Each structure stands twice: as structure tokens, then as C-alpha cells.
Amino acid sequence: MKQQVEVKDLKEGKYVIIDDEACVIKSISKSKPGKHGAAKARVEAIGLFDNQKRSYIGSVANKIYVPIVERKSAQVISITGDIAQLMDMGDFSTFEIVIPDEYKDKVKEGEEVSYITALGKIKLDIRT
């Protein structure tokens, strides 16, 4: 799910959709309006799921999509190799997710973990 906002309303640390990917905004710079033009904004962001750097350049009056990012908790049911089967604690649905290398020692069967979901994608979000 996504919603539309104007570029001038974006803030650092919030989310934005660039190239059909949910991204976290790292920096925003705005130029002054010229004699015959509108002010421009440059948004630098990093992909939430792929960690790729992306940028958007456009008028501050333009509308841009913002993803609806949800943080949820789930219980680890089983671990097979680098794939974990999780059960959502809210609606009790089960799904599988690949465990990133940095979380392999932190994810254990029976424990509760948090995850992020946006634009139909899921990512583990373990904060220490």
C-alpha cells in the first residue's frame, strides 16, 4: 500500500518510493526558485530491502508516493539452513523468510522477532 505526498513534505528518516522500491530518506536538499521556475528538490535514499542508493530530482510541488511500512512481530517456528519459518503474532499466518548473515546467530527457534513489511516484501528487523 502507498499514499501520495508532496516532495516538500518529505523528511529525513522517513520512507519514499523511488524506482518502485521502498527507500529510507538519507538527505534532502532544496534549491531556491529561479526567476522563471519552481524550486527543485534532490532526495537521496537507500533501499529498504536491497540497500541500493537511489536519488530523485524534481520540483518541490511534485507529488511522490510514500509506502506504508508496518513493523510486526512473529515467532520463529523452524529454521532450515538460512530459511526461517515464521508465524505472525497478530493474525497467526505463517511465511518463510531468508535469514541475513548478520542475524544468523540471533534468530533461534521459539523466539519472537520483529519484521518489516512494505509493498508486499518482508525483511527481518532485529534491533540490539
Swiss-Prot record:
InterPro entries xrefs: IF5A-like (IPR001884), IF5A-like_N (IPR048670), NA-bd_OB-fold (IPR012340), Rib_uL2_dom2 (IPR014722), Trans_elong_IF5A_hypusine_site (IPR019769), Transl_elong_IF5A_arc (IPR022847), Transl_elong_IF5A_C (IPR020189), Translation_prot_SH3-like_sf (IPR008991)
GO terms for cellular component: cytoplasm
Superkingdom of source: Archaea
HAMAP family from the UniProt entry: eIF_5A
A GO biological-process term: positive regulation of translational termination
Organism: Methanosarcina acetivorans (strain ATCC 35395 / DSM 2834 / JCM 12185 / C2A)
Modification sites for Hypusine: 35
Keyword entries, A-Z: Cytoplasm, Hypusine, Initiation factor, Protein biosynthesis
Primary role: Functions by promoting the formation of the first peptide bond.
Name under which the protein is recorded: Translation initiation factor 5A
UniProt similarity note: Belongs to the eIF-5A family.
Gene3D superfamilies in the cross-refs: 2.30.30.30, Nucleic acid-binding proteins (2.40.50.140)
UniProt xrefs under SMART domains: eIF-5a (SM01376)
UniProt GO MF annotations: ribosome binding; RNA binding; translation elongation factor activity; translation initiation factor activity
Places the protein is found: Cytoplasm
Any matching Pfam family: IF5A-like_N
